[in-house]
Every structure is written in C-alpha cells, then in structure tokens.
Amino acid sequence: MNQINALNQSEIRIDWSMSSPGLAPKSWRVFDSSETPANATRTRVEEELKWPAGTAAALNFAFENRLSRTTGWDLNALADTAALQMAAKIFRRGVVTSEESPRTVSGSYAITFSNHADPRSDLQAEAIHILDQSVQRLWGIKAREGDLVLQLSETEKTLETAAKIFAHIADTNKPIQIIGGGILADTAAFAVALAGRSFELIPTTLLAMADACVGGKTGVNFGKHGKNQLGLFAFPSRVIIHSAWLKTLPTREIKAGLAESYKHAVISRDKSFSRTLAELEPTAEAIKPWLHRIISVKAEIIQIDPNEAGLRAILNFGHTLAHALETISQTHNPSDPLLHGEAISIGMRFATYLSFTEGYLKASEHEHLQTELKSAKFMISNPEFHTHLGPVNNLWPQISACIFQDKKNVGSAKTTEWVLLKDFGEFVQTGSLYTVAVHEDHIKKSWETFAAQESLLQS
C-alpha cells in the first residue's frame, strides 16, 4: 500500500506487476482426445471473436467438470490445442496450460479526479465512445459516427455482446473510451482487451467508480455457469472520476454503490468511516467528499495483489452469496432483478453471520456489524428484496447450485471458499489465501437459520 498517495486528491496512481496467468497450478487436469471436440464447426460467436472452433465447447467442458483457477490444463496428449488454449486464456480470467509458461507483466495507470465543470468535457473528440444509452439520453450526448451506444443489463453481459463490441472496433485504431456503469465497463473492457487494444474508463455510477473500474477485472457471465466466469485481467490506461455523473443516477443505484463502498470501509478497519457510509444520504453531494477515500481502499489492495493471488480476495467479502442471489433473481425476475450492490448488502450480512457461526468472529463484533448493516441507509428492505428476487420457492438448492460454481473454489466438491472475518476489518487467512473452505452442511444450516431470523424466506 506504500505507493498510493492518499493526500493527492486529484489523482491516485496504481503501479502493478503480476504473473500471467495469475495462479500457479496446485493440480493438473490431463486432457485426452476423447474430451475435445472433433471437427467442430465454428459458432457465430467464435467467428466474430476470431476464436478457434471448439472454444465454447472447451469452456463448457471445464465448467461442467468444475475445474478451478488453480487447476492447470495438461494438453500434451493432444495434437490440436488451439481451442483449449483460447479457452484457458479466459476461463475464470486465465489458467495455466502445459504449453504456456507464466510470465510477469507490469504497468501503471492513473485514477484521475476530474475538475471540469461539466463531466462531458472528459470525453475526447478523437476517441471512439462506447457509451451507455441511459447516460447518453440523460446527458444529451450526441453519438457520432464510429461511436457505439448500448443499453446493457446483466442479461446482456454475455459473449455475444462482447463479440458485437469486438467487431465494432476491429477496423479502427482510434483511442477508446468506455462511458457507463459496471456492466458496460466489464463487458466492453473485456472485448477491447480481447482485441489487444488499450482503453480509458469513465464510470458514471457509484458502483463502477468504487469497484468495477478499479482493478483490471473484465469479463462476462456464462449462462448457467454463473456470473463473471469468463474474462481477462486488463488494466485501463486511465480512469476518470467525476462525481457529477451521480446527479442523474437513481437513488436505488446510489444505495447499491454505497453498499459496495461500505465493504471498503470495513476493509479499511476504520469504524468511524463505516459508520459514516452507513449513515450517508444517497445523494451525489453527500458522497462527493468521500469518493477519493472509497476508491483509495481498493486501489491500495490492487497494487499489492493485482491478480487475486492472495490479499485481493478480501474485496469479495459478501460476494459469494451475492452472486448466487443475483443469478437467481435474474432467472425469476429478469425485468427487475436485484442490483449487484443490493445483493452485496445481504451477502455481507450473511458472511458476517457465517464468520460468527464458524467460530472466527466474536459475538460483540458480529452484533456490531449486523446492527450497523441492518440500519444502514443503503440496506435493501425485506419487501424490496422479495420483490426483486422474484417468486422463488425452496431457495437453498438454487443458492447451493450457484455457490459451487464460484471462481474462488479450489478444493473439495463438498466445500466452497468464503471470505470471512475474524475481527472488524481483519479477515481469516489460511496460508497465503484469504478464503476459508466451509462445508456445504455448515453453509446450509447457517443460511437457513440466518434467513429465518432475518425474515428473508418467502412464506
């Protein structure tokens, strides 16, 4: 954390260095010819992304066999490895294969806090703008020839959308700016990175400012296999922050961003900071003085651990359950699902409870966090939770199916990896990892007790 200048309110600079692919294999999966598609026909997405035929099938195979980020792919027995090599590059943001030795990559980028009177002044005239449609409409931004305007929800955060963006930028060498929220940033940055191009990010939501645009994670969802399962680590050339974008953001979206920001306050180990964010009014004016500090917390962690080999995992506090709830919500209520931050607010409460029931977090800290979270102005109410989750019966089997596809999982088929607390802002560490393997039976029991106590189960 030593390189981040927290006193410089106009810029945060992140210098990063990491291994690519990110994690050294703990085991190897030997592939043989019977497991690889023979004479595969290129799908439309494979054609648009210029991938070898069989890449999508290889990805499906890896997920169906529950391979993890720490499972290397041994391709030595295969004559044609092109499809598997491409799949390995983006599977859970990259895994090692027998044909590719990890290499060290490094770079630097600035998170700039713009002082322009109008945030639209940060849009470069010479750049291609990949632009959120709502932002375009609310701010009266005229799309020019070469720009791409998209309206994306989690449903459209797919390889198909990435392929559309990839094709759009294929024949130009102009600079690229991505202007919008986290879904657009994740998807467009993934497509641009696949094309080997650099990009600037201009986040227009609090969630994107605090999380999605800081850290280099890009990617898309992959159908039944879950949220953010395909992607690349690809760092922007610059991130431009302007709080004025938040003035047109719906209150619900601001609350969702504050939930993610609260997680950063917990990580900072500063109870006054967490209390401030819990009590903060969900307005652009109230948030503006705190933006630099909110973003600095994640920036410091990214610089230490850019590819989530260790410490960065704590940024996933609350995310294991949250991703499951999001997936379930998008299935049962696709027109108005839970927002990411809303799911995180519930996920943090459950992760805190699981930390307590697993014996890591003492009762007083558990009570403190639960009380603060439940009373926070950003916390989604139970009626809102039920509305956005959709008409779901027998919730646990669906949660279980989702969490066992989580990217953090590395071990037994009966355990999943969780980011748990041992004190306020202190996370349980096992060796170099900041995740804990919890048995399915423990998770089920804790969830059912927690959900009943908090009235999260629909009658």
Regions found by a protein language model. Name each.
Residues 4-16, 20-32, 37, 49-51, ...:
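ATP/NTP phosphate-donor binding region
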Residues 14-16, 51, 62-65, 72-74, ...:
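C-terminal charged capping/lid subdomain of soluble metabolic enzymes
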Residues 152, 179-181, 317-318:
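Glycine-rich beta-strand-to-loop/alpha-helix junction loops that act as flexible
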Residues 178-179, 202:
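Structural motif
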Residues 183-190, 209, 324:
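Short glycine/serine/threonine-rich phosphate/pyrophosphate-binding segments
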Residues 275, 279-397:
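Active-site segments that bind and position negatively charged phosphate/pyrophosphate groups
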